[in-house]
Amino acid sequence: MSEKQVFSTEWAGKTLSVEVGQLAKQASGAALIRYGDTVVLTAAVGSKKPRPGDFFPLTVNYEEKMYSVGKVPGGFLKREGRPSDRATLTARLIDRPIRPLFAEGFRNEVQITSTVFSVDQDCSPEMAAMLGSSVALVISDIPFEGPIAGVDVGRIDGKYVINPTIEQAEKSDISLTVAGTYDAINMVEAGAKEVSEEAMLEAIMFGHEEIKRLCEFQQQIIAAVGKEKREIELFVSDPELEAEVKAASEGKMKAAIKTEEKKAREAAIEDVKEEILESYKAKELENEAEILSEVAHILEMIEKDEMRRLISQDKIRPDGRKVNEIRPLSSEVGMLPRVHGSGLFTRGQTQALSVCTLAPLREHQIIDGLGTEEYKRFMHHYNFPQFSVGETGPRRAPGRREIGHGALGERALQYVIPSEEEFPYTIRLVSEVLESNGSSSQASICGSTLAMLDAGVPIKAPVAGIAMGLVKLGDDYTILSDIQGMEDHFGDMDFKVAGTKDGITALQMDIKIDGLSRQILDEALTQAKEGRLHILEHLTSTISAPREELSAYAPKIITLNIKPEKIKDVIGPGGKQINAIIDETGVKIDIEQDGTVYIASQDQAMNRKAIAIIEDIVREVEVGEVYTGKVRRIEKFGAFVELFKGTDGLVHISELAHERVGKVEDILKLGDEVTVKVIEVDQQGRVNLSRKALLEKKEQPEGDKKPQAEKKFYPKTKKPESK
């Protein structure tokens, strides 16, 4: 496969081409994807030998190159650094549909790297990278049960659209990414504007039709350039040892799993495992370490199989709940006295404390990635400390999981956030997971709803989230509501659904089997709605509406509208004027290009003072108006009076009084307050004032009046002609 080969098709009205054989030829498989003007190279490499251990070491990287959009990276080094949140989320998005399609027991390391070379804003590099990852794997010698494909789906005026453009996405009420094989769906990620379960299911199935077409397209590529798959040594337990361990643990594991409380159950299961491991240690076998590792793996599989059998056949969950039963709920608001809003949400042994912070709009987050520069005024961050599951270990920066869960919560709550005009604040939510036994991301959504209501944020409606699970044995399946950690770990699906009472706002699905049918998806969505409404009822019983007043410690923001041409007057030369206002009042000021002014401070009196100053600066003088101002400067020809902040006018000496004034100081002194009338604003904007126009003209007594000389008008005479 040394010569370049190109395969083309149409994708959402744009040309899609896959080029193989020219680039990255030393990788196990590589493909250059051209979608419109978007270009992404994906390379897949698989190690020849398996790694020790009982896990599959798959790594997916998505690398954004700033040159792809004609930008130079910021910062001192001027080169790409750690992945952006968007790149991290994209890597997770690609990993999730690919991982289930490697064989059970696959232990060879696989690394997939997608590098973005060029970006057309209307042709998603994320979807190109997902397709490229599948192509790179299916044409390589790495055993992989693909192909897969992914598409974005939108809905505009009730009509579904594949890979919507930026303009279309802004009008869409669904933002869905769906991935899968020709036969089934195995990954869903969605945000929505309170859409129904039926509409979301139709969007998923609409996307799957396009996925089928892309999988057929990849089959053509496989037939032309696909390599023969290599033989891989899969991790398989020794049948005799497996039977021996099963016999030793029979009955004991079942009883341990049925222990309802999490910590007690974990201890009981650990006791069973430890007892059996100790029995093998006592045998003093030659290859003891290898045998003990295999026994531990077999015990893990026995635990998994027994939990799945209890749920599927006996309909018994580890904690004794029914399959559609929600764990006990409790919640509280206002726990933290100095924060702007807080909410504690507990569901069984999962607990999240969410905190809401309000800030001026200037504290938004600037997003400068491969798209156009934008800013976010709403953020949700998720933290998962190890003490939440009773473990120790180093505390590191947020990883892929924490970034992903934070983004899911943000997507779920985004639709209910009030507009900038309604609520001119930057809103940051932080969810601290204090206990975890499954569904912590959904607990963070519930806690965040409580925190915003406690902070007085006028959200459109409360949002709740629930995680659904699945245990599928052959054709028999059981859907679980509100899964706990063990059911998530050993189950076949983690299906998170968040929304209001009127519809879905976010959806995320990961599965460990090949895919799901429409029937299972439909039932899971219906069961999730029942659980969501139950949780919403609990949340609104704790706090039913936003608090009428913001916290005393939250900034109070007042909005003022001025003419855009007056912005320069408020800012002043070099920012002198606006900085003077900030220094005098201690407020924070943001001015938009349309003339909207946001003034923020915890002290309302200072807010009002700043508004008064700005109103003075932008006030326009009108002829005939009367003002009271201070004398700021005196010259021989008159006095300059400050009418209001930033606006002076001249009272000419002849306009000080009706009688003749010898010196200005005879009437006015520096700092005097004087009432004046505007008599003229000239073409240069200079203001002329009069004091005497407001004074009554004094009448002289009859005896004091001097007789006026009679005015005589003389006729004009001709000058004598010169001779």
UniProtKB/Swiss-Prot annotation:
Encoding gene, per UniProt annotation: pnp
Upper lineage: Bacteria, Bacillati, Bacillota, Bacilli, Bacillales
GO BP term, example: mRNA catabolic process
Keyword RNA-binding attached: yes
Principal location listed in the UniProt entry: cytoplasm
Enzyme class: transferase
Homology family: Belongs to the polyribonucleotide nucleotidyltransferase family.
Superkingdom to which the source organism belongs: Bacteria
EC number: 2.7.7.8
Domain KH: from-to ranges: 555-614
NCBIfam families according to UniProt: polynuc_phos, PRK11824.1
GO cellular component, one term: cytosol
Organism of provenance: Listeria monocytogenes serotype 4b (strain CLIP80459)
Ranges of compositional bias, category Basic and acidic residues: 693-723
SMART domains reported in the protein's UniProt record: KH, S1
Descriptive protein name: Polyribonucleotide nucleotidyltransferase
Catalysed reaction equations from the record: RNA(n+1) + phosphate = RNA(n) + a ribonucleoside 5'-diphosphate
HAMAP family, sorted: PNPase (MF_01595)
GO molecular function: 3'-5'-RNA exonuclease activity; magnesium ion binding; polyribonucleotide nucleotidyltransferase activity; RNA binding
Keyword hit for Cytoplasm: yes
